[in-house]
Curated annotation (Swiss-Prot):
An annotated GO BP: selenocysteine biosynthetic process
Protein name: Serine--tRNA ligase
Name of the gene encoding the protein in the UniProt record: serS
Species whose genome carries this gene: Gloeothece citriformis (strain PCC 7424)
Gene Ontology cellular-component annotations: cytoplasm
Catalysed reaction equations from the record: tRNA(Ser) + L-serine + ATP = L-seryl-tRNA(Ser) + AMP + diphosphate + H(+); tRNA(Sec) + L-serine + ATP = L-seryl-tRNA(Sec) + AMP + diphosphate + H(+)
InterPro entries tied to this protein: aa-tRNA-synt_IIb, aa-tRNA-synth_II, aa-tRNA-synth_II/BPL/LPL, Ser-tRNA-ligase_type_1, Ser-tRNA-synth_1_N, SerRS_1_N_sf, SerRS_core, tRNA-bd_arm
């Protein structure tokens, strides 16, 4: 959530930064500014009334004690004025409450401001490639798409998943299930070694949690809701892990806080009709290891770069070719101030596909979820900066392995770092 004080004091600057996101989208700050002005008028009236009420409370006993009002006319008038002040204060309270709710509702609809270092651009075509890694590991043979080789080997079963659920689900069979488990454990082990504390959070979460990290109210159609219980299926572990600290004041010495978490993730993919209808790239249910950081604002940028490196380290260990892309302002996610996408090479389609999105939200989520920290020896508190990224999406990693590690005989060579987990060197037909 944006800072209303920043909007009030620098409306032109905030408007200009919002406009960097999309020339086609009009983020009108006028209603917020008008409501904010009205709220401050009401607040000023309330303070004046409270001051006068306090004066009356002191004057009445003084008049009684001093005997300066033998007929009690002044005291009577003061009491009547006091009652009027009380009534006026009572009428102000619901007005202030209503306007505050309206302001918050409008603020929740506004995206984060792009970082000044985020490249300007209208859409994904103007994202900037930062680096590539692993060209020497590009396959030398023509390969089948991961869903074809997976079905041939009997480790991916899409047909019966449709029978059990619907499209965009998969059954992992035999070595497919084992490979999924191996990837989860390998990724968690590596990130724990890198200093992340593992969390296994609930995957059913409440509305307040989704609002805190920015998925609600903007993207309600993207998530699965259990309406009878007012709970949602988590779209990413970012939500429950970040909300562990909601309404908390953290001691400054505890920062940075680094968590890794494996969870199933659930997304309706409402806006992706017709996209990636085959394979593991875009499922309603998928597994993911997420990295979440709560950091000091002064170290935010450095911690973001380190987060990207931690995600890259998994792909390097697996020897999967990838590239890092910096998203331009027009392709930036709703809550992100700055974002890098890591894209893995999928040879069957001769393209790179996103496997991790590493975002710096600055204080956007912390302000929504009220996550603050206090530095020793300093007055007051500050909002933390939150960062997160996939470390990695398991299904997409599996799809990259099934394609990049295909052999001419139709088997899959198991990446060396996964062999201790799988207890095998090759995946053949089940």
């Amino acid at each position: 959530m944006l800072d209303i004080k920043q909007i009030r004091e620098n409306p032109e600057l905030v408007q200009e930064k919002l406009n960097r996101r999309s020339a086609a989208k009009d983020y009108d700050l006028t209603p917020i500014l008008q409501l904010d002005e009205r709220q401050r008028e009401l607040e000023s009236s309330r303070v004046q009334l409270q001051t006068r009420g306090n004066e009356i409370s002191k004057l009445i006993p003084q008049k009684i004690k001093g005997g300066s009002d033998p007929k009690g006319e002044e005291i009577k008038a003061l009491k009547e004025e006091g009652n009027t002040v009380k009534n006026q204060l009572s009428s102000l309270e619901p007005q202030e409450k209503e306007i505050k709710a309206q302001i918050e509702s409008l603020l929740l609809q506004l995206p984060n401001l792009p970082s000044d270092s985020t490249p300007l651009g209208k859409d994904e075509t103007e994202n900037v490639e930062i680096r590539r890694w692993g060209d020497e590991y590009l396959p030398k043979i023509k390969v089948l798409p991961h869903w074809e080789i997976g079905e041939k080997l009997g480790i991916l079963d899409f047909e019966r998943a449709v029978k059990v659920a619907q499209s965009r689900f998969v059954n992992l069979i035999g070595a497919g299930a084992a490979l999924e488990r191996a990837l989860i454990n390998f990724m968690l082990d590596r990130q724990i070694e890198a200093g992340y504390l593992e969390v296994m959070p609930p995957i059913l979460i409440n509305t307040t949690s989704l609002q805190g990290t920015g998925q609600l109210p903007k993207f309600s159609e993207e998530s699965f809701k259990c309406s009878e219980d007012e709970l949602w299926l988590a779209p990413t572990a970012e939500v429950p892990v970040t909300n562990l600290y909601r309404d908390n004041v953290i001691e400054g010495e505890q920062l940075p806080i680094k968590h890794c978490a494996y969870t199933p993730c659930f997304r309706r993919e409402a806006g992706s009709y017709g996209k990636d209808t085959r394979g593991l790239i875009r499922l309603h249910q998928f597994n993911k290891v997420e990295l979440v950081k709560l950091v000091h604002p002064e170290t935010s940028e450095a911690e973001h770069e380190a987060l990207v490196k931690d995600a890259e380290a998994i792909l390097q260990a697996l020897k999967l070719p990838y590239r890092v892309i910096e998203l331009c302002t027009g392709d930036l996610g709703f809550g992100a101030a700055k974002c890098y996408d890591i894209e893995v090479w999928l040879p069957s389609s001769d393209t790179y596909r996103e496997i991790s999105s590493c975002s710096n939200f600055r204080d956007f989520q912390a302000r929504r979820a009220n996550i603050r920290f206090k530095e020793k020896g300093k007055k007051g508190t500050q909002y933390v900066h939150t960062l997160n990224g996939s470390g990695l999406a398991i299904g997409r990693t599996m799809s990259a392995i099934l394609e990049n590690y295909q052999q001419e005989d139709g088997t899959i060579k198991v990446p060396e770092v996964l062999q201790p987990y799988l207890k095998r060197e090759v995946i053949g037909k089940s």
